[in-house]
């Protein structure tokens, strides 16, 4: 192999390594999942009627995402990925098979706040069915 071939190969490898760092960061799994709203947190007025919402928990060390649906087929967030500065993307767990009850109740999924997320600034969470914002914590 001549030196120009080696330089081309090295340049190509560098591009591949650089592109590998451009994708979505690793996914994070929930630490807790339960029926109901988080305790000690007031639901925003926008959640009246069953709109999804999110809030800081444990002084910002965690956050909860509240989704509404059937108590027997509860909607849950399967994972969260950091996609940018204070930008998160969530994936939903697949709906279970079978018959679901016709009630409409809150269900909370809790995650550890990812490294690099600034809790004193607003955080945007994009879910398949909409976008939620957690207001920054006041110092």
What residue spans do the PLM features occupy?
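Post-signal peptide N-terminal segment of mature Sec-exported envelope proteins
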Residues: 30-50
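Extracellular/mature segments of secreted proteins
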Residues: 30, 80-83, 108-109
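Bacterial signal peptide processing site
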Residues: 23-25
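C-terminal motif of bacterial Sec signal peptides marking the signal peptidase cleavage site
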Residues: 17-21
């Amino acid at each position: 192999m001549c030196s120009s071939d080696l330089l081309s190969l090295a340049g190509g490898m560098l591009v591949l390594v650089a592109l590998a760092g451009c994708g979505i960061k690793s996914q994070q799994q929930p630490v807790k999942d339960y029926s109901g709203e988080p305790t000690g947190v007031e639901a925003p007025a926008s959640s009246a009627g069953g709109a999804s919402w999110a809030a800081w928990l444990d002084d910002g060390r965690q956050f909860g995402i509240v989704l509404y649906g059937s108590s027997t087929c509860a909607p849950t967030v399967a994972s969260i990925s950091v996609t940018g500065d204070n930008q998160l993307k969530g994936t939903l767990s697949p709906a279970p098979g079978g018959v679901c009850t016709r009630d409409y109740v809150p269900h909370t999924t809790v995650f550890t706040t990812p490294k690099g997320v600034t809790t004193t600034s607003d955080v945007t969470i994009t879910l398949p069915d909409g976008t939620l914002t957690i207001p920054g914590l006041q110092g």
